[in-house]
Curated annotation (Swiss-Prot):
The keyword Cell wall biogenesis/degradation does not apply. It is found in: Cytoplasm; Nucleus. This is c-Myc-binding protein. Its main location: cytoplasm. Belongs to the AMY1 family. InterPro entries: AMY1. Binds via its C-terminal region to the N-terminal region of MYC. Associates with AKAP1/S-AKAP84. Interacts with MYCBPAP. Interacts with CFAP91. Gene3D superfamilies: 6.10.250.1060. One of its GO terms (molecular function) is transcription coactivator activity. GO terms for biological process: regulation of DNA-templated transcription. Keywords: Cytoplasm, Nucleus, Transcription, Transcription regulation. The keyword Cytoplasm applies.
Amino acid sequence: MAHYKAADSKREQFRRYLEKSGVLDTLTKVLVALYEEPEKPNSALDFLKHHLGAATPENPEIELLRLELAEMKEKYEAIVEENKKLKTKLAQYEPPQEEKRAE
């Protein structure tokens, strides 16, 4: 009987933890939103993931990574543009490919 009470006590502690941290409230809201959807989505799991993801605050590291990605994209575009210009310049000094083969 003591084993049963210990398991029950752990469950109750876990339930209180979920309640205090807002997990139960958030899950309930998302499930109610799914229930109230006039047209049910094909994937209920995707619906839950999307709505739960929107409910959690952004990790600051994610924003830093987004900024870094934007910077890298800009650098990439600049390098691609520079590469095009250098290829054009180089083409002026090199004979066309067909002339090279004839030699």
